[in-house]
Amino acid sequence: MSRCLIIINPVSGGGAARRYALDLQWKLSTLFETIEVKFTRGEGDATRFAKNACERGFDAVFCMGGDGTVNETVNGIAQGGFSCTFGFIPVGTVNDMSRALGIHQNPTQAI
C-alpha cells in the first residue's frame, strides 16, 4: 500500500497553505492509496513529522510552506534515513529553494 505524508505550515504565506491543501490532497490521491496530513504548530514539528513518516515506511513526504518548512522537512527525512521521496509546494514569502530549483511560484501551478 503506497502512503504519503503532507506537512502543512498553516501560517506560511499569510495562511495560504490551508487554501491549497485540498488541491494537493486530490492530486496526490491519484498516486497514493493513503494520504496523511499534519499541520505544524511550532519549530521542529516538520522535522519530527517527516522523520516519523520515514521510520514508519511512508513512500513520500510532501510539505507546503516556506523555506523554513522545507528545511525542517528535509532534515527530518535525513534523520529518518533518506527512505522517503520528497516534494514541496512553495507557499512562503521568499521561497528561495523553489526559485533555485525552477519550481513555479504559484502554488496551484506547482501542484
Map each language-model feature to its residues.
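ATP/NTP phosphate-donor binding region
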Residues: 1-61, 75-76
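Glycine-rich beta-strand-to-loop/alpha-helix junction loops that act as flexible
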Residues: 10, 64-66, 89-91
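Short, glycine/acidic-enriched loop or turn micro-motifs at the edges of active sites
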Residues: 12, 70, 93
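Catalytic core of DAGKc-family lipid kinases
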Residues: 30-31, 40, 55, 78-111
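Phosphate- and divalent-cation-binding pockets in alpha/beta enzyme and binding domains
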Residues: 48, 72-73, 96-97
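Glycine-rich N-terminal segment of FAD-binding domains in flavoprotein oxidoreductases
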Residues: 60-68, 72
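Short Gly/Thr/Asp-enriched flexible loops that form oxyanion-binding sites at enzyme active sites
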Residues: 69-81
